[in-house]
């Protein structure tokens, strides 16, 4: 009879001991763990794994390997709800961690708190597996070793048995805070030992201005988030404009505006994008106008917005539209640029004023603007060339035109490179107009050197004309033969 009583009593204490080992926080914490399914470019299942929320608005962590090659991903919560992964926010392929955002379908989701300090060697640890059941069996163990990663972060060796299906499950401390992301064991010690990358290290992963070139991120087809700071995000936008598809770039602009709603640059960039699609329908121009108006509302430097509006309208008119959209004329462009100048007469605004006046064939007004620019800190070969061509169109003294071209070429890199060589051709023709044939011939020679002899028959004809007028008859004969 005593033996019969002892057995149930022993079982009772074993059960009680097992329950005591399961911390109270497990029931709530397990709801933050989810399953992930990733899909390739053909929308076929690529990988399955685990992850967990670290913020109630959908920020989550998992392993990078799970996402490599994925075009989309879906998380499945412990309650069976499916939610898409919307943004990749950072990754490290060496330590196999990734940070991402889930487009949650609820106001908030259960989330774990990331531990601020690393547990000590010998501390208790719990691994929370993904489960759709009410009860959950935690894997318990100890922290065997703590090593440094990237200076202030940590990587853990755990005395704990882990199954393959537990990769990327959270590893918790006694307070119910997550300190690690479980990683696959390897080698001969897989029965008693596993590893965990620091959750704080995974949280530190970010998108930077240079992330567009990161091979680890490029191997994931899911959309990337923006850098957290405005300056970095603006650089990222600039780089993305030439590397992303139009649709992806538009989504990135939308993200920027949501993230930095008080930054006028986002509205200006999106307005320019909308205007570039204007040929597909007037509604795109309507959207551009709405963004320009919003930019004016939020901008601290309204002159910059007026300048960009004028610049866009100027470019629009240069494209020679079949039918002008509303008031997008040179006159309206000029009005906006002059509003910018009234606020702050920056040389770049005055240069745009000159360009618009030149397009309107108001050459006197354009020359006056270019002359102001040429006394400023942005004077360049291009600004002096603009002044020279404008003066030429005004039938100005040919020698004064040449003098402006001299200033243009003086500001070019010396010796003249192929990029600046066309200015030599322009000055050669202006020298001919000023009856300075020998100087024209020398300009043609300099051009020939700058382009390393890559010229055509027309070049030899013009140089022959200069040589003939300069009474260099043998040279003229040689060039006409080449022509």
Task: Spell out what each predicted region is.
Residues 21-22, 39-57, 63, 82-84, ...:
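A conserved glycine-rich beta-strand in the N-terminal activation segment of trypsin-fold
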Residues 22-26, 109, 181-252:
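C-terminal cap/linker of serine protease catalytic domains
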Residues 55-126, 133-137, 152-155:
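Conserved active-site neighborhood of the chymotrypsin/trypsin-like protease fold
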Residues 243, 277-278, 282, 316, ...:
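Structural motif corresponding to the intra-repeat A-B loop/turn of tetratricopeptide repeats
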Residues 268-269, 304-308, 348-353, 382-387, ...:
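Alpha-solenoid helical repeat scaffolds
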